[in-house]
Each structure stands twice: as C-alpha cells, then as structure tokens.
Amino acid sequence: HLRNHFGSKPFKCDKCSYSCVNKSMLNSHLKSHSNVYQFRCSDCAYATKYCHSLKL
C-alpha cells in the first residue's frame, strides 16, 4: 500500500516504458503486447484480450 504514497513502481514491462505498483497490474498490461484474444462474444465474431470489454 505504501508504494502508492511514495510513487514507487518496481514492476516494469520489458517491452515498453510502463511500470506499476503490483504484479497483477503488470500481468494485465502485458496482454496489450500479446496477439491472443481469448475472450469471445457468444453472439458474433468479436474477440478481445480483456474480459471487461465484453460486459454491458
């Protein structure tokens, strides 16, 4: 929690300049560099990297 107050961002992306305060945020960011679209709409051909993109 204290990292948020001190601006410490020890988790760094090895593909760009992104950095963050925790590993789960970094793992989520790493999907942006991937070509894997694992979440698919059941009604059409739409596919996305993020599950929240399918929600209404």
Curated annotation (Swiss-Prot):
GO MF annotation: an example: zinc ion binding
Recorded GO CC terms: nucleus
Record-given protein name: Protein hunchback
Zinc finger (C2H2-type): 1-5, 11-33, 39-56
Top-level taxon in the UniProt lineage: Eukaryota
Principal subcellular localisation of the protein: nucleus
GO biological process, one term: segmentation
PROSITE patterns recorded: ZINC_FINGER_C2H2_1 (PS00028), ZINC_FINGER_C2H2_2 (PS50157)
General function of this protein: Gap class segmentation protein that controls development of head structures.
Keyword Zinc tagged: yes
InterPro entries: Znf_C2H2_sf (IPR036236), Znf_C2H2_type (IPR013087)
Location within or outside the cell: Nucleus
Family note: Belongs to the hunchback C2H2-type zinc-finger protein family.
SMART domains registered for this protein in UniProt: ZnF_C2H2
Keyword Nucleus: yes
Keywords: Developmental protein, DNA-binding, Gap protein, Metal-binding, Nucleus, Repeat, Zinc, Zinc-finger
